[in-house]
Amino acid sequence: MTDTNHSSMRQHSLQSLAIAAIGVVFGDIGTSPLYSLKEAFSPAHGIPLTPSAILGVISLLFWAIILVVGIKYVLFVMRADNNGEGGVLALMALSLRPLNPKSRITGLMMALGIFGACMFYGDAVITPAISVMSAVEGLEVATPQLSHLVLPITIVILIALFWIQRHGTATVGKLFGPIMVLWFVTIAALGIYHIARAPMIVSAINPYYAFSFMSEHVLLAYVVLGSVVLVLTGAEALYADMGHFGAKPIRLAAYVLVMPSLVLNYFGQGALLLLDPKAIENPFFLLAPQWAALPLVVLSTVATVIASQAVISGAYSLTSQAIQLGYVPRMKILHTSELAIGQIYVPVVNWLLLFVILCIVIGFKSSDNLAAAYGIAVTATMVITTILAAVVMVKVWNWNKLLVAMIIGVFLVIDLGFFGANLLKVEQGGWLPLGIGALLFFLLMTWYKGRHIVKERTAADGIPLAPFLQGLLAHPPHRVSGTAIYLTGNDTLVPVSLLHNLKHNKVLHERTIFMTFVTRDIPYVKDHERVTVHDAGEGLYIVKAEYGFNETPDVKAVLEEVARQRGMTFELMDTSFFLARETVVPTHLPGMSIWRERVFAWMHQNAAKPTDFFAIPANRVVELGTKIEI
């Protein structure tokens, strides 16, 4: 094949990935024109709809997109990939790699990363609510007589969206890219039409209007910043979804279609307001002629459902990562596609999200009321991403500290400005994502610390495996036919389940495997590096299986690899899996306060069973109980 053909294929692949990325990565930020400008000129802010104010706000929107999306995320943050993977937990894992595990900075970076992940969930319950609701509210413009149906229709759409999750979205997901391309082309065309009617709006490109607006209104302008940040909702997805599509396709989509379309639409809305300030009641839908209003409502609703789907899938992926990294208890994870590795479904997360989202929709009743709650989760995550990226630049990339200080300083001023402006909205609704984030942060930190204490207690009371096996082989118990697999969290200690089996049954299987799963701080582990097998003699094997934080442990696949390496065969129905069922008992021992220990014990009790998590046949499992005092 010629170099020209290779180049053509690469180009085609890049374009295909870019279109696919548009359907997943840019749904959230792509639907922000539905409510952003309307919220900026909310009557509660008291900003007059004068030409200078309109130009000033549009200028702020424009430069926010350029600086935060176009420069910070696309040019800088997306460079900080963890073996190709992005997202706040991947960035945290990367930033922790060169640090001393016992240093304070390590604890701070870990806490920041976990809090950033928790704030994502705060964002994940608001995005579907505000996006779908704002789209359906277009009925108030298209067919005012149906305005009383906005809330019921929103609820029905959201319930249907979460109901279909268990069946997977791989089939309809192929349509997401083309539909979102149509969406961006449509909003760009609507913007261009009105820009042509009021070309004066183009002067908002000049940052003078942004600075003039800020200096003229000062305090009010700072409040407006809390609404301006709504144009950036979903910017974090550019980085978080990098592992699915790669940096190049996302950059191509951002610069060629997404950012130009967003800018054109915001400028079009600004032009409409210059022509008719009364259009502020719903500037997005009033961009369309009356005959196109209803089709635009339908397209908007589909686009917001796609945006919501991206957030929901992101919540599943983040939960899976957090489980593998040890910050969240085991949960049942179902794979909804045999072909697409990343297509997963987490039932607990799905139904909790739906419950909270429905409560939000019913409680807030309109997208206007909900807008105040939106920005704070986004800006908090932006600040955390900037700080973690700074650590990576200095510690991992070894960049000049002065250069990093200059770059990060500019980004932090912008991020903290937006975050501070959103703190003013805590009383109006900002308490919601903050409360969700704080509660989840407490639970995740409690789980992480509790597991650390359990490991310490287990290690202190544990028996080293190597000398134990030597003694066992010197004075072997009665051997029985078949294979026994002992799942253990520490490959240097004797599994408690083995001690119980020897104590009560006084037998050892002719083939005994001690299997440990280890999660590394990279997203994926190469197949040839995954499984190591140590032959301890006389049919005893120590197996260590390493997985990345984006992977799900697979007992069956590990056994197949062990069989390949050692020339064995395994019959699942002739194999027994021995597990230790730990019962955590809160005490007044040093570690955590007794009430946190009780919370941890409750989480531990309600974690998914290892049989469900590791997909082990339940009828082949022997569980032996053990108590651990913490």
UniProtKB/Swiss-Prot annotation:
Gene Ontology, cellular component aspect: plasma membrane
Membrane topology: Multi-pass membrane protein
Keywords annotated in UniProt: Cell inner membrane, Cell membrane, Ion transport, Membrane, Potassium, Potassium transport, Symport, Transmembrane, Transmembrane helix, Transport
UniProt key word Cell membrane: yes
Pfam families: K_trans, K_trans_C
Transmembrane segments: 17-37, 51-71, 105-125, 144-164, 175-195, 218-238, 255-275, 283-303, 344-364, 374-394, 402-422, 428-448
Molecular function, one GO term: potassium ion transmembrane transporter activity
Protein name from the UniProt record: Probable potassium transport system protein Kup
Lineage: Bacteria, Pseudomonadati, Pseudomonadota, Betaproteobacteria, Burkholderiales
